[in-house]
Regions:
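Walker A/P-loop NTP-binding motif of AAA+ ATPase domains
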Residues: 4-191
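Conserved P-loop NTPase/AAA+ ATPase motor core
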Residues: 210-293
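Conserved phosphate/pyrophosphate-binding and hydrolysis machinery centered on Walker-type P-loop NTPases
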Residues: 7-12, 37-38, 113-114, 138, ...
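Hydrophobic face of alpha-helices
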Residues: 15, 117, 169, 203-206, ...
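Short conserved motifs of the RecA-like P-loop NTPase core
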Residues: 2, 106-108, 181-197, 205-208, ...
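Generic hydrophobic alpha-helical membrane-span motif
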Residues: 161, 204, 261-265
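AAA+ P-loop ATPase catalytic core
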Residues: 90, 103, 175, 190-216, ...
Length: 293
C-alpha cells in the first residue's frame, strides 16, 4: 500500500493519475528517453473539503522534489510581488514543485482579465525553461481565463466529486472505527441520509455524533446521536425552544410522509431521512421539514 492508498479513501482514478505524475517527476530521464515532453502543471478543482490539499501534499512528498507552498494571505499591492518571488525561489531550487493553494482566493473580482491571473500566467511562462512542476487547487474555475487552463500550463486538470456509495460508507466507517458504534446502526443508512457531502463534512458529523453520545452517557454511539449531528451539520436543523403545537407537528408529519411514500413508490429504497424539524428550529412554511431521497 502506497501513501495515496494509506491516506486517501476512494478516488481510485484520481490517485492513479497522481501516481503517474509522481513517477514522471521522480524518473524524468526514463520518460525523456521515450521522447516525452515533461508535464508542467496540475490543477485540482472541487468543492471545499474533498481532499485537494491532502492529495497535493502526498504528491509533493512522493515526487522527492524540493517543495514550496504559496497562499494568498495579505491583501493589497504586495501580493503580485510575492507571487513572482515564490516562482523565482522555486526556479533557483529546481527541480522543484510549487503548490498554489486556493486559486479562487487570489483574485478580488470575477473577471478572467484580473491582474492576478495575468501575473500568474506570466510567472508560469517565464519559468517554462526551468524544471518546476506547478500544482494548483481551486474551488471554482469558472472565472479563470481559458488561456491559463490550456495544456502546456496545466497539463492535468482533475475534478473531485463528493464521495458516493461504498466510498462514502468506507469514509464513515473510518471516522467511526474508534467510536464504539451501536450494533443496530447501519453505515449505509447514515450515508443515504446525507448524500453527496464532502469528506470533511462526514468527519465533522461523526465527531459530533460521538460528542452527543458522550454527553448523554451512552455506552455506544446511538442512531439518535448521529441523526442529531447530521441534521445540525448537513441540514442546519436544530431543535426549537419555541412552544410546540402538536396539531401542526402532525400536519407537517403527514405532509412529509406523503413525500416519502411518493419517493418510495417511484424509487424503491431511496428514502434517506424524514424530519419535521425546520431550519433554526422553525416550524411552518417552507422551513417546516423535508424528506431526503
Amino acid at each position: 500500500m502506497d501513501k495515496f492508498d494509506e491516506k486517501v479513501i476512494g478516488y481510485d482514478s484520481i490517485k492513479e493519475t497522481l501516481r503517474q505524475i509522481a513517477d514522471v517527476l521522480k524518473r524524468p530521464e526514463a520518460y525523456k528517453e521515450k521522447g516525452v515532453s515533461m508535464p508542467r502543471g496540475l490543477l485540482m478543482e472541487s468543492a471545499p473539503g474533498l481532499g485537494k490539499s491532502l492529495m497535493a501534499s502526498i504528491l509533493m512528498e512522493e515526487s522527492g522534489r524540493k517543495s514550496f507552498v504559496f497562499r494568498r494571505i495579505n491583501e493589497g499591492n504586495t501580493f503580485l510581488g510575492e507571487m513572482k518571488d515564490i516562482f523565482d525561489v522555486a526556479k533557483e531550487e529546481a527541480p522543484s514543485i510549487l503548490l498554489l493553494e486556493d486559486l479562487n482566493l487570489y483574485v478580488e473580482s470575477n473577471s478572467p482579465y484580473a491582474p492576478e491571473w495575468a501575473c500568474l500566467q506570466a510567472c508560469i511562462d517565464e519559468t517554462s525553461d526551468a524544471d518546476i512542476f506547478v500544482i494548483a487547487t481551486t474551488n471554482d474555475t469558472r472565472y479563470m481565463p481559458q488561456s491559463l487552463l490550456r495544456p502546456g500550463r496545466f497539463d492535468y486538470i482533475l475534478n473531485l466529486n463528493p464521495p458516493l456509495g461504498k466510498t462514502a460508507e468506507d469514509i464513515v466507517s473510518y471516522y467511526l472505527c474508534d467510536k464504539n458504534l451501536a450494533k443496530d446502526v447501519q453505515i449505509s443508512d447514515i450515508v443515504k441520509a446525507m448524500p453527496q457531502v464532502s469528506c470533511a463534512t462526514l468527519e465533522t458529523v461523526m465527531n459530533l455524533a460521538a460528542i452527543n453520545s458522550a454527553y448523554r452517557d451512552h455506552a455506544h454511539v446511538q442512531k439518535e446521536d448521529i441523526i442529531d449531528a447530521l441534521l445540525k451539520v448537513v441540514y442546519n436543523l436544530r431543535k426549537t425552544d419555541c412552544e410546540e403545537d402538536p396539531q401542526e407537528h402532525q400536519m407537517i408529519a403527514v405532509h412529509e410522509a406523503a413525500h416519502a411514500v411518493v419517493g418510495e413508490v417511484l424509487h424503491s429504497g431511496s428514502i434517506g431521512i424524514i424530519t419535521i424539524r425546520g431550519s433554526h428550529g422553525a416550524i411552518g412554511g417552507m422551513e417546516s421539514g423535508f424528506a431526503v431521497y
